[in-house]
Amino acid sequence: MSTIPISRTNSGGKVKGFWTPIPPKFPRIFFLLPLFCLSSLAVAQTNLSSYTPGSTYWGRNNYTEYIAGNMPLIISAPHGGDDYPSELPNRTNTSTYTVTTDPDLWTANLARAIRTACSNRYGRYPHVIICNVHRAKVDCNREIVEGAQNNTNTQTVWKEFHAYINIARQQVTNTYGRGLYIDLHGHGHPIQKNEIGYDLSDSDMFKTTFSTTDDNESSIHALSERSRQSFTDVVRGELSLGSLLEKRGYPCVPSVSSPNPGVSNGVTNAYFNGGYNTQTYGTSLANGGTIDTIQIECNYTNVRAKSSTSSYSEDVAVRANFASNLVASLEEYFKYHLEMTMDTQATPPPSVNSFSDKTILEDGFTSTSSINLASASNTFWGESSDPNIVDASGFIFGGSGTSRNLVVRPRANAYGSNVIVMVYQQATNGGVGTDWYYLTVDPVNDAPIFPSLSNRTINPGVSLTIPAIATDVEGASLGYALVSGPAGCSVNPSTGTFTWRPTIAQSGVTYPVAIRATESGTGGLSSTLNFQTTVNSATAPQVSTSWISGDAQSSPQVQLSMNGQLGPDYLVWASEDLVNWFNLGTATPTTFPFVWTDANASQYPKRFYQIRLGP
């Protein structure tokens, strides 16, 4: 079959060089992709089921390579080839354009690493298209006139590459309804940042807020229309692809930290915003379609290779690490903006209700959100971006049949802003759709919290110490006061420690105790700790006497052996006439029997003893 390539031109009729920054907005001209003449591939495009996920399909002389996938993700590496076949002439400059021949080193390897990362994570494969021919021979990110010039064999390589892209796009569309195509490149700019291209010009990138026209002409217009975020946030907000990669340690532009390329010495820093592939296959309003396209221009250090002097094994590890983090970032990106999981297995994924952002007070509940299931057999669940604020137990689902609902209950005393509440719905055929909203939990001033405290039972005379220390969620300093309690007790005003030693007179009674903790400052909240302390009844001691150290003529001593209750003081009193009593001493035994010795007993013809309890 014969085909006529149609090139995008500028107003002067000259073929546009897509390696240069995109000029001010211009009318979009559709590019009709010519099918190359190999009958096997031409037939294959109408028989998509002949491509087995995970299998590799080759173009002529293995110049192009298609690894079929079963995910809504397409990866291409048009400039990663290093084959230098003599049958293909080197491309040359013309009067209308200057060719770029530098390859994007290691991008083919990086594309394979991304495929491996997907396989490791999901057991599934992205669609991968690689041009194995050196860029000096063919450029598959330019229109065919510049990319293949006038050589028939070179044009075949170019056509094969783009036919494989269309096969992958059709596979994704047929299977999932929508998806993402990433055109993988490598830049040599001195600033080591990944450059994420959405077909926005340099002047666009310096805008504070993108316009509707910018959105309509971007390569992710369909995704932007689906996302609950503004186009500006989709491009460089906290959930943009650049920011998701950056939080994993890979600086990117645009992102929250680098919303535009920046300026050095009065000159805008170099930034590749997209090329022929993003303009041709992106979902601009003019192009239509549902396969959004992003160009990623990877920096060299710690992305495509460890360094210019590192070993091959070190470089392999670096690429594997970046690929793993890119896949993790894309997993989030799909859920936030494409409303599907990256490992969804059906077309189209079930739709989840759109939710409004919610703001509640700490320790409260959200209002009820309706969830309409496509089928009563579908399953649904939720997760949050911050389990410290909303954990799995905080998702309370209700309803029945296809009419379900959700209430979210944050953890006690937890608060924070912009917590992402994600809801999933999975169909029986494996399709998984998503939607989400921001939950803000505003803090409230909580009263101090005392730890739980059991009632106490003690003997009279036992010193009771209770560290009744309260905590304050907001970290306010606390003061303590005794609200009520038995005579003789006290509370430390700074530490809240309660102390008391009950007297004998207080035995046999249960005493309520109340301690108040109050936040410092005017209007501080307070809490009260209540508990009871029971003082056992005092029991009379048992006493026996004995003589030691000889007879009365050799200064004998009297020993008093006592058994009784631990806690009280034991006061030994003596008298010679049972009228006048005097205290011989006081002891607080820690064990029984307890022995008291009267060393002066032999001085008296008779002596009486009495044991009294105190205090």
Residue ranges and their predicted role:
Residues 417-419, 431-437, 511, 524-531:
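Extracellular and select intracellular beta-sandwich modules with Ser/Thr-enriched
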Residues 45-344:
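N-terminal catalytic or cofactor-binding beta/alpha core of small enzyme domains
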Residues 388-411, 487-503:
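Strand-loop-strand motifs at the edges of beta-sheets in extracellular beta-sandwich domains
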Residues 348-385, 389, 411, 433, ...:
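Extracellular ectodomain surface segments
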Residues 425-431, 518-525:
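Short, solvent-exposed loop/turn segments at the edges of extracellular beta-sandwich modules
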Residues 439-445, 533-537:
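Interdomain boundary/hinge segments at the C-termini of tandem beta-sandwich modules
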Residues 347-351, 445-449, 489, 496:
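Proline-centered linker/hinge motifs at extracellular inter-domain junctions
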Residues 536-615:
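Short, composition-biased motifs enriched in small/polar/acidic residues
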